[in-house]
Amino acid sequence: MVDPVDAIGKARAAVTQRAELPGMSLMEHLDELRRRIVHSAIYLGLGFAAAWVFHDRLVDFIQAPLKNDGKSLNMIHPMDGMNLAINVSLVGGAILASPFILYQVWLFIAPGLYQKERRFVVPFMAATVGLFLTGAYFGYFWVLPAAVHIMLDVFGKKFTAVISIEEYTSFFLSIILGLGISFEMPILIFFLALFGIVSPRFLWKNFRYAILLIFLVAGIICPMADAVSMCIYAIPLLALYLVGIGVAWWVHPSRRKAKAAKAAKEAAH
């Protein structure tokens, strides 16, 4: 297992090393942060406005798995319909605005990065958005239809389904956003390895613990309690963990130091 004290020390050293780079004062950092937050909020507002134009189609989109199973949503409270339109527009707007918001994050952190680390910006943004959309796609076309079928047609076949808009929206977003965020695992491993907090050897050595943790996470975000559904959640996450090990091997400081030492040795000869 990882030593928490050692991990914290490595993280602190990485932050301290960047703090020593020539840059802005604290007040300048705060002012820059304020600007980036304002710009991100503007992009989010524009994304919301664009999504609102198509909110009827977005509502049909999230209802499709239910309609394909012969079910429909029920309005329990007078505000349910409007709340659904607002929620789907917010989520859709956030997805539309995410590349621009990530760019604002990049503009804020770029002054504190070395030139060799800045080359990761385009792959980072593309991978972050791509992995989230892949997780959301997997959730919508695979997990959600299976969940609807199991809960309504298998366990609920003896009952009359009265599905409220609020409960279904929460259920839908927990699957789509939960898997979208979970699919960002290689990005998290990338940064942990880049700063030397974890190594590919550590990740591989503790693979069995990762399996337990991934199945625990799958059990938390999975709406079904059966083992098959948990495996549907967990197997892609295990594959992404293995991808993360490859990413860690690629960016870990020990590999970069070894390459630099080899280059210096060859230059000496």
What kind of region is each of these model predictions?
Residues M1-H269:
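Membrane topogenic/interface segments and analogous intrinsically disordered interaction regions
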